[in-house]
Amino acid sequence: MMNTERPAGPLRPPHPPHPPRYLALAGPTASGKTAAALAIARVHEVEIISVDSALVYRGMDIGTAKPSAAELAAVPHHLIDIRDPLQAYSAAEFVADAQALIAAITARGRLPLLVGGTMLYFKALLEGLDPMPKADPATRALIATEAAEQGWPALHAALAEVDPVSAKRLHPADSQRIARALEVYRLSGQPLSSFQTTKLIATNEGVTGARGQKCLNIPENDRCLISLEPQNRAWLHQRIAERFDAMLAAGFIDEVRALRARGDLQADLPAMRCVGYRQAWQALDGLWPMSELRDKGICATRQLAKRQLTWLRSMPERRVVACDAPDALDQVLALARDFVNAGNKLQGQP
């Protein structure tokens, strides 16, 4: 049995006035990020910064697999429940908020631990963010194949589900622009319209957001990205199915009904387009039988996980841990310990 209690010896992150350092834990949905983060928190003095575009919304607890009240109380968490579902939360806002939190947590003598699966946010912090993804021949070819099989009006309808703002501007026969909008969404997980309004630009000093603020320019030696990735995709698929079943049993449909009952939320809001919520909303609208919700929700979640893994593989500095390995948690804790101890040595701490 692995001991995850905080030891008496010094395993403390560097203290100010030293430059900030941070540890990051990324992975696809259902890969075990929350459990790993809490295990790290039992050993090291950390505060968790959520890197999840769905967890920012209040009243969306079950379908987002939000940490429980006990988990939130066990260690300080940030960027959870900070927006009403009526409000948007952009990548630019995340960069600005994360910048301030990394500095503040460091000033308190603790280590920022960034945890989540919104890869666009990680990319903004780690690499800077281009205005929008470049053309990808493989994605374009797949879209062209779908268009040949289904027709452009069908793809326009698919675009309307993920990017209603762009779809509203485009004619169903405007194949070139529909293809580009779908390409951007599939590559980034974000609608084309969000890139057109966010206006993030990458600079040599960091990322400048819509509010004119830059993220911290932290050298690679002062940051560590641990990536939870399955060796066996079937393992992750099983976890996704089990988690969706648990959400349904916990009252997920009632949670979506309560959101609809507010009367001020619409299906095209960013919050309501979150995976699971979109499918439940459509089922409640009668677009398909409620009996199909489970399969559609699981399918959409698997597609999300596939996109997340594609993003992760484009991050060369990540340190991969096979999340389906029996000793996955031990590996995560070893990487975290090495990172913290390396920082202590750099600062002359024992």
Curated annotation (Swiss-Prot):
Record-linked Gene3D superfamilies: 1.10.20.140, P-loop containing nucleotide triphosphate hydrolases
Marked site positions, Interaction with substrate tRNA: 118, 140
Xref: InterPro entries: Dimethylallyltransferase, IPT, P-loop_NTPase
Keyword Cytoplasm listed: no
Superkingdom, natural source: Bacteria
EC numbers: 2.5.1.75
Residues the entry annotates as binding substrate: 29-34
Gene Ontology biological-process entries: tRNA modification
Keyword field: ATP-binding, Magnesium, Nucleotide-binding, Transferase, tRNA processing
Cofactors named for this entry: Mg(2+)
Ranges for region Interaction with substrate tRNA: 52-55, 176-180, 273-278
Region (Disordered): 1-20
Matches recorded under SUPFAM superfamilies: P-loop containing nucleoside triphosphate hydrolases
Quaternary context: Monomer.
Similarity comment: Belongs to the IPP transferase family.
Protein name as catalogued: tRNA dimethylallyltransferase
Species for this entry: Albidiferax ferrireducens (strain ATCC BAA-621 / DSM 15236 / T118) (Rhodoferax ferrireducens)
Gene expressing this chain: miaA
